[in-house]
């Protein structure tokens, strides 16, 4: 692509426009700069709210994939890629899922998490290769993340994913983007120009983070990873999380701290199992079988025993 064509394409993007509200931000004192940033940030949740129907459709596809043993794969470059990796990395400790159930891929590989890798996003072949390296299958869901909606790395990945029958989802912050035209589903929150022209780590990045939170959280709830609003599948891997596990058992059952600690010791800190045992009086093997029969849904297992 020629330089002139690239400039022309960027000029058409909402996310690359100049924000008329911040033309004189370089003249402002610190407090007023921060107030301008905060004012602009307040537009982000509204933009996300407008695309909830698209987010819901995406969640339904992700849930269907999980139920068939499929995976959720995020892919992006720069800030978009980092946000995908961040969200993916939070799923194992929060929901006790395997580390390869939600995967984050970033153009340039792991080094790009901390350092800019020159030209990494410009090659669609790298996007295809990244998905081949993780042995993408038709049961997986690929979410291509690109504020501009035109990142070659993401385009290459989405085209490959679609060619093998995987569900494809585009997340961009520009209407009618290239990746939206490729993917099966498009999520396109339009947050408008940034306070610093083209610095899409700001409002656009915030919108992406909110939506990625929604995709994984709602999907995990739908497959039984919560009871009420409690993280009953939390992986208690450090002192803080062990303390949280104790609190969750206490909150779910009304038991004492000592009783919560006792039943967690019996289950090896399996919170969901501990709650079921404490509420129903089941032994550990009976509770484990009941959870399996309920498909991992704690509420169903409790209802089946107490009905």
From Swiss-Prot:
Gene Ontology biological process terms from the UniProt entry: 1,6-anhydro-N-acetyl-beta-muramic acid catabolic process; amino sugar catabolic process; N-acetylmuramic acid catabolic process; peptidoglycan turnover
Reactions that this protein is recorded to catalyse: N-acetyl-D-muramate 6-phosphate + H2O = N-acetyl-D-glucosamine 6-phosphate + (R)-lactate
Principal EC category: lyase
Residues annotated as the enzyme's active site: 90 (proton donor), 121
Keywords on record: Carbohydrate metabolism, Lyase
Pathway connected to this protein: Amino-sugar metabolism; 1,6-anhydro-N-acetylmuramate degradation; Amino-sugar metabolism; N-acetylmuramate degradation; Cell wall biogenesis; peptidoglycan recycling
Disulphide-bonded residues: none
Recorded superkingdom: Bacteria
EC number(s) given by UniProt: 4.2.1.126
UniProt cross-references to Pfam families, sorted A to Z: GKRP-like_C (PF20741), GKRP_SIS_N (PF22645)
Molecular-function annotations in GO: carbohydrate derivative binding; carbon-oxygen lyase activity; ether hydrolase activity
UniProt xrefs under SUPFAM superfamilies: SIS domain
SIS domain segment(s): 62-225
Note: A lyase-type mechanism (elimination/hydration) is suggested for the cleavage of the lactyl ether bond of MurNAc 6-phosphate, with the formation of an alpha,beta-unsaturated aldehyde intermediate with (E)-stereochemistry, followed by the syn addition of water to give product.
Subunit structure: Homodimer.
Function comment: Specifically catalyzes the cleavage of the D-lactyl ether substituent of MurNAc 6-phosphate, producing GlcNAc 6-phosphate and D-lactate. Together with AnmK, is also required for the utilization of anhydro-N-acetylmuramic acid (anhMurNAc) either imported from the medium or derived from its own cell wall murein, and thus plays a role in cell wall recycling.
Sequence similarity: Belongs to the GCKR-like family. MurNAc-6-P etherase subfamily.
UniProt name for this protein: N-acetylmuramic acid 6-phosphate etherase
Underlying gene: murQ
